[in-house]
Amino acid sequence: YDDGVNLDTLGSPGSYANSLAIASVDNAGFTGTYFQVGQRMFSYTETTGYSNEPLATIPGEYDYIFIDGFGTEEDFAALNGALEGKIAFCSRGSTSFYQKAEAAVKYGAVATIVYNNQPGSINMDLSDYTQSQPCVSILQSDGARIRSVSEPVTDDGGQELYRTGTM
């Protein structure tokens, strides 16, 4: 009986036909990581084994910039310095994960959060990342939720440039 969707792992022999698997309530090895936007918690996938620090190394509240773009250098340059000292949110796609993070850091980001552009989680490869600022990923649906609660920032003509908030 399972009445909720959650992160789980099922291995052999429990995954074989005609077998019975029992879930354990003791978890000595996996603790979920999350950040908060508004009143909601969002889990993320930490990218480890590269030069980047964990997201938890930047404690406290930070403002963020949420762009609808892929996190190219041009996307971040167009923010005209607004990213300085903030966390960057950008979409998966168009450029490699390390290029997104490198570009965000170049324009002042203290961390980069990549939201998936399709359902499911991302296992990012940051092999060529040369910075220490954190870079993590979140689900597409979580990216959409964060975008929806973020405040739009517009130019003088009313065109949306990006969205912002605090986490």
Residue ranges and their predicted role:
Residues Y1-M167:
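Structured lumen-facing ectodomains of secretory-pathway proteins
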